[in-house]
């Protein structure tokens, strides 16, 4: 027993050290930093000094309309992006898994390739495609009588959602496709023998069997959505877009830290965003756990 305990300690120690170094320490430092503010001493003529201000930075962030509106943008983004991503990725995976699909490897690679493009490059590509003077897509739309300003207040959110979908649709499709490939083929054969058609098998057999993967992807997508930063940042730089420097909470924190040098406020905004992500993650995992427990009791 002691030998097992020693072996477990030896194996787990590197993990806990790494976890502490890359997770616990940065979060702890952000919390500590959020409790302080740099102020000018000597009636503004002296140097700066770090002053303990308690929860003042949190109050300032929550009281700032721009920060609150950033959460509103995130809510709209999540409501538009998450259903499209999950539905699109699952639909493509089901299509590739069907008997009708041909050239699966080619389409897997073609759909996954956008994920290999760095986020900044992807955003720059789409900024080019959104710019009327440069984009053949916009020019073709205008020639067809379809006028849409991708940089307008109404078009900014769909523009960002489109970039994110282009980046992540293929990646999540691969996850769903792997889960579908792991389904016991005898289950599908039995459903076919019972007279189930392709649609019935897809939505009554396959989808319920990949719900665990669906829940995992949904959780990671929610967390990733809260971290929205790169795509709107690129749209904010010199495009004339309605995306402002505080469009999302992450951009608000970035602006506070590097444009206004208010690291305490930036840390407070980051901690509030992290708490939101933690609460949503807890809620999703709790709901998933309850559904599994309910099914277990029913069985």
Question: Predicted segments — roles?
Answer:
Residues 4-299:
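A structural signal for multi-pass alpha-helical bundles of membrane permease subunits
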């Amino acid at each position: 027993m002691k030998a097992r305990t020693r072996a477990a300690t030896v194996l787990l120690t590197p993990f806990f050290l790494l976890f502490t170094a890359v997770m616990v320490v940065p979060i702890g430092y952000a919390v500590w930093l959020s409790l302080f503010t740099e102020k000018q001493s000597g009636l503004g003529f002296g140097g700066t000094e770090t002053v303990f201000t308690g929860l003042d930075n949190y109050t300032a962030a929550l009281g700032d309309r721009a920060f609150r509106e950033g959460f509103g943008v995130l809510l709209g983004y999540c409501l538009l992006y998450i259903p499209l991503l999950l539905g699109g990725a699952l639909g493509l995976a089901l299509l590739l898994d069907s008997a009708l699909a041909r050239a699966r490897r080619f389409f897997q690679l073609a759909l996954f390739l956008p994920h290999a493009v760095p986020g900044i490059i992807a955003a720059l590509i789409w900024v080019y495609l959104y710019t009327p003077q440069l984009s053949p897509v916009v020019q073709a739309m205008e020639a067809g009588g379809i006028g849409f300003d991708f940089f307008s207040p109404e078009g900014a959110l769909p523009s960002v959602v489109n970039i994110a979908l282009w980046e992540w649709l293929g990646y999540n499709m691969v996850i769903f496709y792997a889960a579908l490939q792991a389904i016991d083929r005898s289950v599908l054969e039995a459903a076919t023998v019972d007279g189930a058609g392709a649609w019935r098998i897809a939505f009554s057999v396959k989808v319920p069997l990949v719900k665990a993967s669906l829940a995992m992807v949904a959780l990671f997508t929610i967390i990733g959505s809260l971290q929205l930063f790169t795509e709107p940042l690129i749209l904010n730089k010199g495009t004339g877009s309605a995306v402002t420097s505080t469009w999302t909470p992450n951009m608000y924190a970035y602006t506070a830290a590097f444009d206004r040098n208010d690291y305490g406020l930036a840390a407070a905004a980051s901690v509030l965003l992290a708490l939101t992500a933690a609460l949503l993650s807890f809620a999703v995992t709790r709901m998933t756990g309850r559904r599994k427990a309910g099914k277990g009791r029913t069985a």
